[in-house]
Amino acid sequence: MSTTGKGGKAKGKTASSKQVSRSARAGLQFPVGRISRFLKNGRYSERIGTGAPVYLAAVLEYLAAEVLELAGNAAKDNKKTRIVPRHILLAIRNDEELNKLMANTTIADGGVLPNINPMLLPSKTKKSTEPEH
C-alpha cells in the first residue's frame, strides 16, 4: 500500500478543531446565524451578503447595551435593583438621540415623563422682611 492517495489524513480541518460560531468570530453576543436566517426568510432582498448579518447584529447589540446601561442607571437612581419598563422609558426619553430614534414607540407599562407646566404651579409670593407685630 502506498502512503499517498485517498487513504491519507483529512486535509483542511484537524480532528481537534471545533466549530466556531460567526458570533464568536465577530466577538458578539447577539446571534449572527439567527439574524442571517431572519434576513433570508424575510425576503428583504434576493441575496444577502455575508457581512450584512454581522453588521446588523453588532448594531443591535450596541443599541441594546446603550439602553440597558441607561435603564440600569435609572433603576439605580430610584434605588431599585431590577430594571422595569418604567426605567427603560425614562432612559430612552431622557437621552436625546434615543428619544429621536424611538419617537413613535410606545413602551407598555412605561408611563410618561413627569412634566408639569410652570403656569399650573403655585406662584411664589415674596415674603416681607418686616417682622409681624
Swiss-Prot record:
Crosslink position(s): Glycyl lysine isopeptide (Lys-Gly) (interchain with G-Cter in ubiquitin): 124
GO cellular component terms, alphabetically, are: nucleosome; nucleus
Subcellular location(s) per record: Nucleus; Chromosome
N6-acetyllysine modified-residue sites: 6, 9, 11, 13, 18
UniProt PTM? Monoubiquitination of Lys-124 gives a specific tag for epigenetic transcriptional repression.
**Subunit:** The nucleosome is a histone octamer containing two molecules each of H2A, H2B, H3 and H4 assembled in one H3-H4 heterotetramer and two H2A-H2B heterodimers. The octamer wraps approximately 147 bp of DNA.
What is stated as this protein's family in its record?
A: Belongs to the histone H2A family.
This protein's name:
Histone H2A.1
Q: Which gene encodes it?
A: HTA2
